[in-house]
């Protein structure tokens, strides 16, 4: 049974495919379906965007589709960049520019006021239009400089005090066990397992 990931982000596809392996689905990217137009992420919340993307992918492919919207919420910036995390520094989306803008905005902010969290909402859309959602978050602190080579996005700036490493320094297995996406996906996998059993009957 196919599960379409409603993203062309290679880093995200790799991460999600690895996490979803145990579910028994054949995981494919929306990029394998020519003609699909990327959905504009214009929702006010992560849930709005995830649902919109999942529904569009399920409708286009006729398959079960999964989409996530996630981002960084920095307390000193009143929750920004939030839903604008991927395009914080404008279009085209650029991790380097986004990280530079974040560091610039937090210049002079003391370490104990640089608290932040990654939040993720996963939406699963059935071809009939039924929607299921799951959410996860991970608390951390924004560093003053990039650390680590792994991950993507804000990972090199997001420091997890409990592990004394940034998301970019953690190995994939450890990151997946504590990350916002990992936590949301754990809940989503329970939904997927129920749907899989239902389909097999």
From Swiss-Prot:
HAMAP family for the chain: Non_canon_purine_NTPase (MF_01405)
Entry cofactors: Mg(2+)
Reaction catalyzed: XTP + H2O = XMP + diphosphate + H(+); dITP + H2O = dIMP + diphosphate + H(+); ITP + H2O = IMP + diphosphate + H(+)
A GO cellular component entry from the record: cytosol
Record's keyword terms, sorted: Hydrolase, Magnesium, Metal-binding, Nucleotide metabolism, Nucleotide-binding
E.C. numbers: 3.6.1.66
A single GO molecular function term of this UniProt record: nucleotide binding
InterPro entries (UniProt xref): dITP/XTP_pyrophosphatase, ITPase-like_fam, RdgB/HAM1
Binding residues for substrate: 7-12, 70, 152-155, 175, 180-181
GO term, biological process aspect, one: nucleotide metabolic process
Co-factor remark: Binds 1 Mg(2+) ion per subunit.
Keyword Metal-binding: yes
Binding site for Mg(2+): 40, 69
UniProt protein name: dITP/XTP pyrophosphatase
Entry keyword annotation includes Zinc-finger: no
Enzyme active site: 69
Pfam family, one: Ham1p_like
Stated family: Belongs to the HAM1 NTPase family.
Subunit structure: Homodimer.
Protein source organism: Desulforamulus reducens (strain ATCC BAA-1160 / DSM 100696 / MI-1)
Stated role: Pyrophosphatase that catalyzes the hydrolysis of nucleoside triphosphates to their monophosphate derivatives, with a high preference for the non-canonical purine nucleotides XTP (xanthosine triphosphate), dITP (deoxyinosine triphosphate) and ITP. Seems to function as a house-cleaning enzyme that removes non-canonical purine nucleotides from the nucleotide pool, thus preventing their incorporation into DNA/RNA and avoiding chromosomal lesions.
